[in-house]
Amino acid sequence: MFVEALKRQNPALISAALSLWQQGKIAPDSWVIDVDQVLENGKRLIETARLYGIELYLMTKQFGRNPWLAEKLLALGYSGIVAVDYKEARVMRRAALPVAHQGHLVQISCHQVVDAVAQGTDVITVFTLDKAREVSAAAVKAGRVQSVLLKVYSDDDFLYPGQESGFVQHSLHEVVAEIKKLPGLHLAGLTHFPCLLWDEAAGKVLPTPNLHTLIQARDQLAKSGIAIEQLNAPSATSCTSLPLLAEYGVTHAEPGHALTGTIPANQQGDQPERIAMLWLSEISHHFRGDSYCYGGGYYRRGHAQHALVFTPENQKITETNLKTVDDSSIDYTLPLAGEFPVSSAVVLCFRTQIFVTRSDVVLLSGIHRGEPEIVGRYDSLGNSLGA
């Protein structure tokens, strides 16, 4: 999906990854991340958000819940980390990093609510009154007031499978009335997902029905005299979409893919955020005229299409296609069109969620001053593997 953008925006990352692979320092099935470019992307996002008065929570799941990289990004001015599930929150808190938003996309499990509240999470999203009551009890126990967001939806909204949740908009007044009765809770705002999506036909990011539901819910509360301070609208957050969010009065957004430049809008390599990540593998064997590279990093929604194959003997890079991958099977190997020498390196660049892969994550610094070095090596869940 992003091979051309990678070649255009960050050819030095390709060269650095291949060089370190030749030295035996990077193994197949590794996501190789250009730390300096991620930080530059992160800085651009912060600067753009400030221009429009939008606060940013940092999303880490796309780059493997990596605490080292998260700490560097937080130093740029992000308002804390959004943990999309309780396991991500655990990784970040073990690294002593601030989790600002928890409960969306995945609710906090019952026996972890107390800890989430006690740790000082800025806002917790709730999908049910039952969960709100758990948060209330934890807040009372901790002797603090916990801010919460309500996830809302309407019947015609778009919800990804596995993410069906929230309070239906027409019940909002009744829900808010119940929330107000619960001690230790402060209704801080509303959220939904996805609020923006890339439209291939239009060639740009457009609002979803979900964003309109979110705005209607805010207005519905305002008419009843209930003011909220946070309107959180995640999905497709980037330098070019932040102005659109500002038009709708959004106060908070949660960039993820934009940090690595792997947003659909950047397929041609023409966005402010530059590609900062690639996946490196190696030819394992041939079968019936095609080559197979080591798998483990495939993501079925990643739109991976093209690959670069590097043969050390002649220092040649050849472009080929990734053949159809059966999404119902484990990606032990991935098929590439044509035969290439065994043990040639393979580079792909596609949209990923590293935390659902089996990949290693290799952090590189110094690429653009001609001195690439590995500054960290992690698994896909943010656990250090040593330098």
Locations of the language-model features?
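A charged N-terminal "starter" segment
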Residues: 1-107, 112-115, 381-387
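Glycine-rich tight-turn/loop motif centered on a GG-T
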Residues: 23-34, 118-124, 159-166, 201-208
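Conserved active-site and cofactor/substrate-binding residues in soluble primary-metabolism enzymes
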Residues: 33-40, 64, 68, 87, ...
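Aromatic/hydrophobic pocket-lining residues that form π-stacking "cages" and hydrophobic walls in ligand
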Residues: 45, 135, 214-217
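Active-site-proximal beta-alpha core segment in soluble small-molecule metabolic enzymes
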Residues: 57-198
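Active-site loop/helix belt of alpha/beta enzymes
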Residues: 154-268
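Active-site loop ensemble at the mouth of alpha/beta enzyme cores that anchors a bound cofactor
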Residues: 237-316
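C-terminal accessory subdomain/extension
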Residues: 290-387
